[in-house]
């Protein structure tokens, strides 16, 4: 964002001891005391600075008045849709901080049309106060040459044929349905799961252990290696019950990898006609659709082509421009 507005000065607040490289900016630590410091002391400091606008990219405002027009970005509202997906109900946040932030912000950014609809339904604010700003995709996610891919496959010890899942291992991601569908596939490729253990994952881990050979779990993957993993996959499977946006399908499409997603939340919106959409709750549908993509080279080629074109419509520079539009709107009223 700072690149788009070189005439603007930024004050970035974050954890003590952290360093964020943002041009035209200064860095200041958020007070250490979690509640009183962040919601009372911090707003007082902001008011003293007299900023033209306050931007909360994590979806919340301090409870204290910041003394300027404000914009927040809401990434998803999964905990409101199904609290059982999470280890705790976070009552202070879900009942007070987040609702108050959404109601007070001059402009609320939603990362998808689906998230915008959720904001209206859950909090009752007018749709006119919401601006949709989709996520972007980094240029590093792109088709790679065969030589580079061969080296990456050997270095990362990836199988010759595999279906890919990218995401935290947690209930909301619905990995269990994918595991059931994959286990039923005929002549199935391997399944590579890239992502850390999240929460409430014990039943998922037990199922993964029972499936044995052919299932690979990669934790702590260097982010620089992720484009190569996408490129090497025969297909990305993203069966999530809920996403505010859904970056892995977009990243996979940018790499030219066919994508199969669930029909839930924002995922059909992100892939549009460039991916296949499957019933999130049906292992049989996942099996059948993945077998189609693996076995039909013409279909896979068409999905690769459509995916690259679809992903080209998303960029972080576009996201920055739209975010600035939201901030300008908040400032000018």
Predicted segments, located by residue:
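Carbohydrate transferase catalytic cores enriched for Leloir-type hexosyltransferases
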Residues: 1-333
